[in-house]
Regions:
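Residue-level detector of conserved, well-ordered beta-strand and adjacent loop positions
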Residues: 8, 106, 351
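Structured C-terminal helix/loop/strand segments within mature extracytoplasmic catalytic/sensor domains
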Residues: 12-28, 35, 229-392
Length: 392
């Protein structure tokens, strides 16, 4: 058991998380603890202690956290991509380009327009700001794909590494209907235009030259088989060319958005105060609280993208507790990274992942998300919240 060093942190080598887990009366936690090896659980808790001036100091505690052991981050990587899209907008503004996050744009492959409108936008516009909202509300894959291309893969990785975050590499987009038009190492063209329809920024296709391979990590070969084109292949699935984001890296990104001033200037994202407010607002909303964009309340319930505390419940979230987070769910891996804060001053960061793939076959869509993955993270969130509440 170890604590991860970080900026303005008070590190303690304790068994806090181990004790919380083993003292838990939650059946789902006991079940996972009985088979830790197959579930590849990693948990990072950051307790927040404020001084007399209200300045936060971080006290980190870990359970099985290992940045050298690979887990598939799934949609959690949409969070840094949302941040970097806003950062790129600010960079373009600094170059004199009259562009904003709500400037409409269109996307072209080989000069053919493949995307220009968004039916969930009140004006039917495709904008960076609206795509970010969709990422946090319902984890929209296409929204991530468009932002990924807008930034460029190599530039995205460089931007994260430049602020001191390691053990992080983006390599791919998610499944989308434009895949037949896509060159994986070359983005489409982006054209931003004003209300008159005049072009204000024309971004040529970006070519990515980095070769992403996670072969140095443990656990990149997973399971005993995987499904490809409807056929089961009897060998481990290779994740070495998939996206990679360690528990520590995800947590560090979130800390920089919630408490940017805790970090030195060269460790912060290069965005403006209103960008921080925008990100915090939308990452803490639920589909039920929002009318634009509107999502069906039955399909996209309040805890649809909130796994900690409420993931195994529907219709029970209240304004008393805000969860600023991004979840990931794919290849049997369930992950959440969150800053939790309630009206009584209880606050903490919690990042955790669990693998639930009983048959050890990947890509067969037979995973225990609802039975085990999400309920475990929900129970874990409740245990940590209750622990912090008792301490207060």
């Amino acid at each position: 058991m170890s604590c991860i060093l970080g900026c303005n942190s008070n590190t303690k080598n304790t068994y806090l998380l181990n004790d919380i887990l083993h003292d838990s009366k939650e059946p789902i936690i006991k079940k996972v603890l009985s088979d830790l090896n197959s579930h590849e659980v990693q948990i990072l808790l950051t307790r927040i202690n404020r001084d007399s001036l209200g300045v936060p100091k971080f006290e980190r505690h870990t359970f099985q956290v290992n940045s050298e052991h690979y887990f598939y981050p799934a949609s959690t990587v949409k969070f840094p991509v949302a941040i970097l899209a806003l950062q790129k907008i600010r960079k373009l503004q600094s170059q004199g380009i009259p562009i904003k996050a709500d400037t409409p744009f269109k996307i072209l492959y080989s000069e053919n327009v493949i995307k220009r409108t968004d039916s969930t936008h009140p004006k039917n516009n495709l904008t960076i700001a609206h795509l970010i909202k969709k990422i946090f509300l319902v984890s929209d894959n296409m929204a991530y794909n468009y932002l990924f291309d807008f930034i460029g893969r190599d530039d995205a990785n460089k931007a994260i590494h430049n602020i001191g975050i390691t053990n992080f590499n983006l390599s791919h987009k998610f499944s989308d209907s434009d895949s037949d038009l896509e060159n994986k190492n070359r983005t489409p063209r982006f054209i931003f235009f004003n209300q008159k329809g005049d072009t204000i920024y024309n971004q040529a296709p970006i070519t990515s030259n980095q070769k992403i391979k996670n072969t140095h990590l443990d656990g990149v070969l997973k399971g005993k088989g995987y499904v490809k084109d409807g056929t089961t292949i009897d060998e481990s699935m290779d994740f070495s060319e998939k996206n990679y984001a360690s528990i520590a890296a995800l947590n560090q990104i979130l800390e920089r958005i919630i408490f940017p001033k805790v970090f030195s200037r060269n460790e912060q994202f290069n965005i403006e105060p209103e960008d921080y407010f925008f990100l915090r607002y939308w990452m803490s909303r639920t589909p039920n609280e929002v009318t634009i964009p509107f999502y069906d309340r039955e399909t996209f319930f309040d805890s649809y993208c909130k796994f900690f505390i409420y993931g195994d419940k529907k219709g029970e979230m209240t304004n008393n507790t805000r969860i600023y987070n991004k979840v990931g769910l794919a290849y049997g891996t369930t992950t959440d990274l969150a800053y939790v804060k309630d009206r009584n001053g209880i606050e903490f960061f919690l990042t955790a992942t669990i693998l639930t793939n009983k048959n050890e076959i990947f890509n067969d869509n037979k995973y225990e998300y609802e039975q085990l993955g999400i309920p475990f993270l929900a129970a874990l969130g409740r245990e940590i919240y209750q622990f912090e509440k008792n301490k207060n």
